[in-house]
Amino acid sequence: MPFKKINIAIDGPSGVGKSTIAKQIANKFNYLFINTGSLYRAIAFFCQKNQISITSERKMIKHLPPNFLSLDFEGNVWLQNQNVSNLLRNDLISKNAAIIAQYPQIRKIVTEILQSFQKNHKGIIMEGRDTTYNVMPDADLKIFLWADAETRAKRRLKQNTFLNLETDFQEILKAIEHRDYLDMTRKTNPLKKTVDSIFLDTTNFTRDQIVSQISKLVFRKIGQFSLEI
């Protein structure tokens, strides 16, 4: 029997595990997973590929063609006629995405795409900073994930070690703290928890434990009994 469809928004700081957890929830309930940050990464990729400077929002906007960025209903990100979903994970793109995500007009473009995409649809789980109050303010279930910066840095180090990536703990911690500062102090849609979001501190819990907690919240919201303990 298929699960009832609701829309879920997952918010929280960088490195807290939003994507991993949201993917597991999406797979469990057969929902569509959308990583909102991938759109900022795609714009950063487009600028890098086309040698567009990101130091000025005004100049950058002039070089972005109409309707150049889109999503499909498998959650893939498209730049014009190219699916770039698997081309967006490297340090330079991450760094540049963090910069352009501060620009109000860029955030407006991304938010409009995401809101148009989810309009009149259910069964979508979106994750990203500002998802719970700006991108998906009418979500049926809102979750704000949290963990202290040191815990997030340790998790990132473990992940990088597994991927055989050379990284230093202090460098990771510094990058996470810097990203937190940018997210919390930006003028447009800063990182914050809304009053209607459920706060989950993941610091002392495993990923599976958090997935289990969120699953129970979903079951409760859709009015179905959960066999999970």
From Swiss-Prot:
It is found in: Cytoplasm. It catalyses: CMP + ATP = CDP + ADP; dCMP + ATP = dCDP + ADP. GO terms for biological process: pyrimidine nucleotide metabolic process. GO terms for molecular function: ATP binding; CMP kinase activity; dCMP kinase activity. SUPFAM superfamilies: P-loop containing nucleoside triphosphate hydrolases (SSF52540). It comes from the Bacteria. GO terms for cellular component: cytoplasm. ATP binds at residues 12-20. Pfam families: Cytidylate_kin. Coiled coil: none annotated. Keywords: ATP-binding, Cytoplasm, Kinase, Nucleotide-binding, Transferase. InterPro entries: Cytidylate_kin, Cytidylate_kinase_dom, P-loop_NTPase. Its EC number is 2.7.4.25. Belongs to the cytidylate kinase family. Type 1 subfamily. NCBIfam families: cmk (TIGR00017). This is Cytidylate kinase. The lineage of its organism: Bacteria, Bacillati, Mycoplasmatota, Mycoplasmoidales, Metamycoplasmataceae.
